[in-house]
Amino acid sequence: MTRSEALFEQAKKTIPGGVNSPVRAFNGVGGSPLFIEKANGAYIYDADGKAYIDYVGSWGPMILGHNHPKIRAAVLAAVENGLSFGAPTELEVQMAEKVISMVPSIEQVRMVSSGTEATMSAIRLARGFTNRDKILKFEGCYHGHADCLLVKAGSGALTLGQPSSPGIPEDFAKHTLTAVYNDLDSVRTLFEQYPTDISCIIIEPVAGNMNCIPPIPGFLQGLRDICDEFGALMIIDEVMTGFRVSQSGAQGYYGVTPDLTTLGKVIGGGMPVGAFGGRKDVMQFIAPTGPVYQAGTLSGNPIAMSAGLAQMEALCEEGLYEKLSAKTKRIAEGFKAAADKHGIPMAINYVGGMFGFFFTEQPEITRFDQVTQCNIEQFRIFYHGMLDEGVYLAPSAYEAGFLSMAHGEEEMRLTLEAADRVLASMKAAS
């Protein structure tokens, strides 16, 4: 038994399922999860001391690589002054100014402690501002575990949502409508059914929780136009894509302007953090300037602000995103080339520092129903083959992969050579 396996057995005695977030349990791929002891650059090291080239990056935040010296120095300097004050700090102001300078649609921003807090608060604000109860989300998109968001579509386009988890009253779920990602007609159908009831659309601009699904041309702007037509707010959830896809997020990359934006992951530099921001008139509707309540003991935590600021400043380096995109393209297209070489059907998607691959004969993947038709068993085999080769991918066929600036020529070469060997063995076994 490895030390990771022993720790997992020990953890299950005191932690539900042995993990503090379900995907970490490896239920999507089978086997026991790795317990991580440390990380540096493009590598993570498990409890047995084995190194892995990491394409999870703490699920997105580690865009510069693990344990980056500038971020580490910023955190250590901040710790000297105390860990938490529960009062305003100059660091919060600096972070707000940095975010606003990088994302033109954000005129004011409020810091919180997680992505779930950010989306939950943005939706409450949209409901309060519009005085409407219903929200519209998309099948396959994930916006955190707030009750109103753990909702799946009903049996028809016009049916009300159904809870996707026990513990969520149907009275909550009935206010959440679910449309088809990359399908404007499904959105318009719902708005025509509820023309004065929908407060907002919330969307992942690149869906990163059904693997990696970019928007088709015109989709995001089409949502913007529908919101304007029916008086709803557009919330772009950039918890994953913010400063990961481009310096101004996915909204800058695709040229669409939301009313509200949610942020997380990258803006914390690896520390727990979230934020939501947008139009000043909307943001002024939140307490203490407005009637919509939102608060948090650790919001704007000085350690998190220090780490985030250090990372955000580093991301302003000229040419950084072009380099990151080139790395992502090389890995995604390298996987596809290796699969083609061995006669294994595969589709790929990638944008900025995110990528996804699908074992499927479908030529392209643009919707959730297409994702569910992919070969999950082939993914599991590939996943464990790559893990044995020292490459750590997301342990789920429904999660995006992430590159960092620390992934160099050596790491990419080793990764693609490993993929070639694993795919060759999969073909031989078939």
Swiss-Prot record:
One of its GO terms (cellular component) is cytoplasm. Pfam families: Aminotran_3. The modification N6-(pyridoxal phosphate)lysine is found at residue 265. Homodimer. Its EC number is 5.4.3.8. GO terms for biological process: protoporphyrinogen IX biosynthetic process. One of its GO terms (molecular function) is transaminase activity. Signal peptide: none annotated. Its cofactor is pyridoxal 5'-phosphate. Pathway: Porphyrin-containing compound metabolism; protoporphyrin-IX biosynthesis; 5-aminolevulinate from L-glutamyl-tRNA(Glu): step 2/2. It comes from the Bacteria. This is Glutamate-1-semialdehyde 2,1-aminomutase. It catalyses: (S)-4-amino-5-oxopentanoate = 5-aminolevulinate. Belongs to the class-III pyridoxal-phosphate-dependent aminotransferase family. HemL subfamily. It is found in: Cytoplasm. Its main location: cytoplasm. Keywords: Cytoplasm, Isomerase, Porphyrin biosynthesis, Pyridoxal phosphate. The keyword Transmembrane does not apply.
